[in-house]
Structure formats: structure tokens, C-alpha cells
Amino acid sequence: HETDPDGQVMSSMIETLMFLQKEYANLRYAFMTVNNARSFGSGSERLYVSNKEIKTFEPLKEICEEAGGHIPSPQLENQNKAFASVLERHNKAAYLVVGDSANFTNWAAGQPNEADGTCVKADTHGSWHSASCDENLLVVCEFYFIL
């Protein structure tokens, strides 16, 4: 005897499978797009992305971490160039973090100057400047890719 005479269970399963196949294709496309942008853009394992918001330094860490990223911290010249290209595209400066043991820095002439502030911002050319942590700057987050 049949337990699904009208084929409703089978139809529902087919519909669900088709939906999942479409979702998989969309996710695969999104992943490949990001992966290709990463390898095309800078040859670096880091991707710099802005949500176009303007914020002070304080909320930046939480915003980036909620998105799965970090406050930008370029460690190499090509990473700083990739970061600067985002700033140039938006024509805005953004915060970054400079580690204590940084091998790479890109301070502008006369910088760092703590009289200007204890935070660090990069201008649209990728040059670093001391800045007030209360400045409203472009939100940019850094994402790591290890593929």
C-alpha cells in the first residue's frame, strides 16, 4: 500500500533539494568571487573591505569582529597598497593598528606625532598619520584568507 499516494512528500523533498542546490551554487559563486578578488587584487592573503560607514575608533573592533575580520594592520607593502586602494576608491582615510614589533611601516613625513593623537590613520595614498581616536573615519576591516 502507498504511504504517499499524491506524491506530496516526494514533491516536497525534490523542492527542498532544488532549493539547497541553488543555495550551494550561490555560496560557491560568492566564495569564488571573493577568492578571485583576493588573488587578483594584491597577491596577499588579506582582503580589505569597507561597509561605507563612518565611525570613530571605539566601535571599529566590534564592527570588524562581528563581520569575521579585524582592524586593518598591514604587515607588508603590498598589503598596505591593497588597503590604500580601498581608501582611494572611497576618497577617505581609515584607522589601522600598528604592532609593537612591526617590520613594515609607512609613516608620513613628521609622523608619528603623538600630539596629533594616539590612534593611527592611513590617508588615501596609504601614508600613516597619528590621529585622534575620536575622528570619524571610513570603516574598513581586514580579512585573512588561507587557501
From Swiss-Prot:
Expressed by the liver. Keywords: Calcium, Disulfide bond, Glycoprotein, Lectin, Phospholipase A2 inhibitor, Secreted. Transmembrane segments: none annotated. One of its GO terms (molecular function) is carbohydrate binding. Glycans are attached at N103. Belongs to the alpha-type phospholipase A2 inhibitor family. PLI binds directly phospholipase A2 in the presence or absence of calcium. Inhibitory activity of the PLI-A homotrimer is more specific than that of the PLI-B homotrimer. This is Phospholipase A2 inhibitor subunit A. It comes from Protobothrops flavoviridis (Habu).
